Amino acid sequence: MLIRYVIETDLADITDLMMELGYNTTESEMNIRLSKLNSNPDYHTIVAAIDNQVVGLIGLHLGLAYEFSGCYGRIVCLIVNSQYRKKGIGKQLMDRAKAIVIESGGNTLVLNSGNRTERVDAHNFYENNGFSAKSTGFSKKISSP
């Protein structure tokens, strides 16, 4: 298995992973999103590939904090193909994200996860990897007037 930055030929596999995560999208939409993300140095899209097939993805955003000095990393996306779960792939992706944050001078890694029943396994994974539930997130769709 290879942990590496995303490349153009990963598009179809990434689209499939996003669909598996429950986000309805197309290759064309994902191509536009990835182009924007990849052009911003604060975003890092890392994949796990086995035999040139992307089986996992982690999206990391580096940001500055108001509540402490330095930067932090926010995991904005994490998915491992259901056929490849419980094989250490998610942990390796998390480890790479952690390394990027440390290399950038940060010391905190955060994430949000839905509180739906189907997310219980993900929450257990996060807790087993040292994360602790500390807050409740809120979301609101907005549009211009």
Show which residues each predicted segment covers.
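Helix-loop element at the rim of GNAT/NAT acetyltransferase active sites that forms part
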Residues: 15-28, 66
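A short beta-loop-alpha structural element at the N-terminal edge
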Residues: 1-14
